[in-house]
Every structure is written in C-alpha cells, then in structure tokens.
Amino acid sequence: MCDAPRQLKAIYYRRSDRPRLHLEVSRFRKQLFADQLGWVLKTENGLEQDEFDTDLTEYCALLENGQLKGCFRAIRCDRPYLVRDAFPGIADEDAFPADVKAWEISRFGLHPDNSGLAISLYAAMFDFAERRGARALPALVDLRHERWLHRLGIQTRRYGEPRPVGHDVRGRVLFGVAGEIPIHEQRRRLGMLFAVPRTLLEVTDETSFDGLDRVSA
C-alpha cells in the first residue's frame, strides 16, 4: 500500500487575515523557541509574541498535509524590527537597512522532527522575498545557522562580529551575529538552488497591499 503523496503549502498572511492560524503559529513558536530551545522569551497563555508582532507584520506558515511544521516572521525594514531595535549594540547603527526593499526574517524555525523540511522553508522564504521585491533579508542568527546557510550555497553578509545576545533558561550564554542574505547579487544562484523545492510547494499569499504598503515584485 503506497503512502499518500506529501502536500506542502506555504501561507503568507497578516494576523488579521488568519487569526486562528496565527494563534497556532504563536503556540508553535512558544513550544519551539521557549520550551525546546530554552530561549528567554515573553510568553502568555501558551503563546509566544512580542512587540514586533503587529498588524503590519507578515508571517509564513509551512504546512504538510494540513499540519503546521514550520514558520517565519517578516518585517519590512522601514518599520521597527527585532535585530536593529532589540539588539542595538550588536552592530553599528549605520549597518542596518531602513528601507522598503529589505525585510527582516525572524522566528524562523521547524520542529526538530521535521528538519527534512528545511529546504522547503528556505524555498518559501526566497519565494516571499521575490514577491516583495526584496533586495536583502536581514536577520540575527547563531553561528550554526550561519554555517548551515553557507553549506547550502547561500551567501551572507555580516553587519558585525558575533556577540553575546543573552542567556538561555539554563544560564548558558547565547551568541549571535547580525547580517543579511543579499538577494539581488545572488538571485540567479538562489533560483537554481531552490528551483525544485519551489515546484513542490503550493503558495498562498493572503496579505493585502494598499497605499504605501504596496511593494512591487
């Protein structure tokens, strides 16, 4: 008896577009980042949210056969965003972009049992960037994540050197590095790297653009 074919879907949304899905993503974030990874984060009623989760923040939920498997958060960099505003000493202020063509990626994660879907979540991230006309994706990452990106063939640019960014619940020092994935100068390479994963991914973009919030792709 053959297994049912795997159906992968990425949904881009704002919390007003999908309130029930957003609660599920916030619960997933609490379980992954606070409970499993031990990050010291603000949680309430089983949910993880912070001041950067606003009505204008955009999200990706990665679903396999209708079940949530991963997510990321995207904030346009002409607005307040995590790495610049919550960690101001991690790099020179001039290093951080502040324009509509840069989108910060944060809360990027998969359940450990679904690490095989990492390529699919990256494919969704670069699809999102293409749809938004992004030139760069700033982020705060640990050194292991940075090395993983390089192994995949993804070029990154640091804004500064690795620095302590806090402690986990066990008191261990956490190190991070601020930087970006420059999109424009490696667009062709990224297209080749993720061509196949993107063909296997059904994408639904439920965000609505109007007025100054519209970004041409």
Q: Where would I find each of the regions flagged by the language model?
A:
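Short amphipathic alpha-helix that is part of the acyltransferase structural core
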Residues: 2-48, 59-63, 68
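Short, solvent-exposed loop/turn elements at beta->coil junctions and helix N-caps
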Residues: 44-51, 161-167
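Beta-rich nucleic-acid/ligand-interaction surfaces
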Residues: 47-53, 144-147
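A short helix-loop-beta-strand connector motif used in the catalytic cores of GNAT acetyltransferases and
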Residues: 50-61, 70, 79-82
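Glycine-rich phosphate/pyrophosphate-binding loop shared by adenosine-nucleotide-utilizing enzymes
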Residues: 67-71, 103
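Acyl-donor binding region in acyl/amide transferases
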Residues: 82-183
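Long hydrophobic alpha-helical segments typical of transmembrane helices together
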Residues: 172-217
